[in-house]
Amino acid sequence: MSKFDTSALEAFVRHIPQNYKGPGGVVAVVKDGEVVLQHAWGFADLRTRTPMTLDTRMPICSVSKQFTCAVLLDAVGEPELLDDALEAYLDKFEDERPAVRDLCNNQSGLRDYWALSVLCGADPEGVFLPAQAQSLLRRLKTTHFEPGSHYSYCNGNFRILADLIEAHTGRTLVDILSERIFAPAGMKRAELISDTALFDECTGYEGDTVRGFLPATNRIQWMGDAGICASLNDMIAWEQFIDATRDDESGLYRRLSGPQTFKDGVAAPYGFGLNLHETGGKRLTGHGGALRGWRCQRWHCADERLSTIAMFNFEGGASEVAFKLMNIALGVSSSEVSRVEADSAWFGSWLDDETGLVLSLEDAGHGRMKARFGTSPEMMDVVSANEARSAVTTIRRDGETIELVRASENLRLSMKRVKGEAKHDIIGRYHSDELDADLLLVSEGGAIYGAFEGFLGKSDMYPLYSVGSDVWLLPVQRSMDAPSPGEWKLVFRRDDKGEITGLSVGCWLARGVEYRRVQP
């Protein structure tokens, strides 16, 4: 690493309120176990005019996952010790069951339970109880890929871990975290507060400077996948604990942050609640977190004993800020990609028959395309006539076929262009046997709308948009968790007579949920 330059970090931080507009936030940089930069700005609550401080607690959301895995390693031991308990937990399973290690590494193939809550009729601002979480997870019978073969983000993995840990130890996760993680690390005010409705020390905001900022409503109860609330000072203490134990081969963070592989031996991007990343040739470990009204991110570079943290009480770019702080501290500069103009033959929708996933491409100008495939849009650089890349995805076009590669997910898809005109004979009621949930499709004035119904309630009506013959998109931009699943892909099946018999409903988080038609 080049000479550490705090002035460049300070200059970047001074402009955060201007470049990332929102109510407030905090950032920090820790080097060699010492705080070299910490800053708070804005307000924890706009109405009460409560300032944001270094000691203001905020939900750290999915950053909690590494702490759940830390408890597993510290209070239980190796993940394999809970494999029998997981088999009993997933007692309705028909496919190959994942192992507990697969849960820790997001290789289980289980569909994300927050995404599935949408299919079960959940109200985005509704109450979600622990019993409902278990009911949803325990009804699962299948995975959307063979465990250990790919990466797919799944909050339910860590919710199940929490349940298994509590059952094994006979203690609450609240108590174990406090005793075995927070106290040794000096995280004085960190606490697992499972009920998001009970946290009122800081307000998270939806919106932006165009629509305005409004307090976000959250009423879910979660544990394992999220739920910890902590201040910047608490998170600094965690980074200092990591640094202080760096030379201990049995140290907790060293065990959490080791390299992981898929079952075929290929390096994996995630392990024990940590993203395993690289920048400027340096290995990073960390995680982001999101809930309606909140965003946060931490990164750690063990080789340089360097950590960055960003926490916002609005839906801004905390992940981008923490990553930029890391790059500035490491002296890594960004390079401009050489681009060519996108040929119109790229544009449109492309379907992978096996997964039911759809890639939608549109021109974004200046040699870029906007791609919709995962939970949020990606900007792709068109690097040649038949190849485009984003940070996580590479696509190559050969006539009417696109090869999509996400190397970090061990995923390679062959996608065909979606053609033809959509028929409107899809209206009716469809049933998922696995979820015991329905999808209702209706036509109003020639427009098609869909609604989900299940044990969590009945959803609003959502408009459907056709992209070709028997392939429709159903956008859902608000859900109990954040970010939302995005576009649900609906791929219909017909019999030999051309009659609709059912469909596959899926998104990146929850692929290929099968429905059969029960009522035209």
Swiss-Prot record:
- The Enzyme Commission number assigned here is 3.4.11.19
**What is the enzyme's main class?**
hydrolase
Reaction catalysed by this enzyme: Release of an N-terminal D-amino acid from a peptide, Xaa-|-Yaa-, in which Xaa is preferably D-Ala, D-Ser or D-Thr. D-amino acid amides and methyl esters also are hydrolyzed, as is glycine amide
User: Is Plastid one of the keywords UniProt gives this record?
Assistant: no
Q: How is its activity regulated?
A: Inhibited by beta-lactam compounds such as 6-aminopenicillic acid, 7-aminocephalosporanic acid, benzylpenicillin and ampicillin. Inhibited by p-chloromercuribenzoate.
Source domain of life: Bacteria
Protein keywords = Aminopeptidase, Hydrolase, Protease
What residues sit in the active site? 62, 65
Q: Which residues participate in substrate binding? A: 481
Q: Which GO terms describe its molecular function?
A: aminopeptidase activity
Record field: temperature dependence: Optimum temperature is 45 degrees Celsius.
pH-activity profile: Optimum pH is 8.5.
Pfam families reported for this sequence: Beta-lactamase, DAP_B
Does this entry carry the keyword Flavoprotein?
no
Q: What is the effect of changing residue 69 to S?
A: No effect on enzymatic activity
**Mind telling me which InterPro entries this protein's record contains?**
Bact_CellWall_Synth/Modif, Beta-lactam-related, Beta-lactam/transpept-like, D_amino_pept/lipop_sf, DAP, DAP_B_dom
Q: Which family does it belong to?
A: Belongs to the peptidase S12 family.
The record's section on PANTHER family has:
BETA-LACTAMASE-RELATED DOMAIN-CONTAINING PROTEIN (PTHR46825:SF9), D-ALANYL-D-ALANINE-CARBOXYPEPTIDASE/ENDOPEPTIDASE AMPH (PTHR46825)
Q: What does this protein do?
A: Hydrolyzes N-terminal residues in D-amino acid-containing peptides.
User: What is the protein name given in its UniProt record?
Assistant: D-aminopeptidase
